[in-house]
Amino acid sequence: MSTIAKDQTQVNEKIRAKELRLIGQDGEQIGVKTKNEALEMAERVGLDVVIMAPNAKPPVARIMDYGKYKFEQQKKEKEMKKKQKTINLKEIRLSPTIEEHDFQTKLKNGRKFLEKGDKCKVSIRFRGRAITHKEIGQRVLEKFAEQCKDIATVEQRPKMDGRQMFIMLSPINEK
């Protein structure tokens, strides 16, 4: 059977099925009717015949106001989009030998990202021989996580990836 696009619901004359399982406007089962009988019944009450389940045998149709139905669907879709929250991943780059004031500035930015609800990846890039002192970088990352523990949880512990060590922080959801 052919698939129907989301906004191409079969209504009234566009219905291709010869027989329909009809549901009345109040939700009561009317039974299996021909397409013409269903259209006549809907016309008598000034409503439309809308296919609800096109893949059923016979297809399930309902007598309703199609304009109102379409409006309700759009309203529900809009509401669902509002409820969805996109979570962005922000990255903060530090060095293993970062000074305290620079650290505080980066920390302030990281806290701002977390308070907005974004995830935060804090990374340290080791240059030259600094790679031999990974524990210094790990201490910096753990200090960062420690100072954000009131608003964030550690999603991923400090981990090496090539010449870079990183930690993932995600915001604590208030409910």
Swiss-Prot record:
A GO CC annotation given for this chain: membrane
Keyword Protein biosynthesis: yes
Localization (cell): Cytoplasm
Gene3D superfamilies: Translation initiation factor 3 (IF-3), C-terminal domain, Translation initiation factor 3 (IF-3), N-terminal domain
Molecular function per GO: ribosome binding; translation initiation factor activity
Pfam families: IF3_C, IF3_N
SUPFAM superfamilies the UniProt entry points to: Translation initiation factor IF3, C-terminal domain, Translation initiation factor IF3, N-terminal domain
Protein's GO biological process: ribosome disassembly
Alphabetic keyword roster: Cytoplasm, Initiation factor, Protein biosynthesis
Function: IF-3 binds to the 30S ribosomal subunit and shifts the equilibrium between 70S ribosomes and their 50S and 30S subunits in favor of the free subunits, thus enhancing the availability of 30S subunits on which protein synthesis initiation begins.
Subunit structure: Monomer.
UniProt-listed NCBIfam families: infC
Family named by the database record: Belongs to the IF-3 family.
Name this protein carries in UniProt: Translation initiation factor IF-3
Annotated organism of origin: Staphylococcus saprophyticus subsp. saprophyticus (strain ATCC 15305 / DSM 20229 / NCIMB 8711 / NCTC 7292 / S-41)
Gene giving rise to this polypeptide: infC
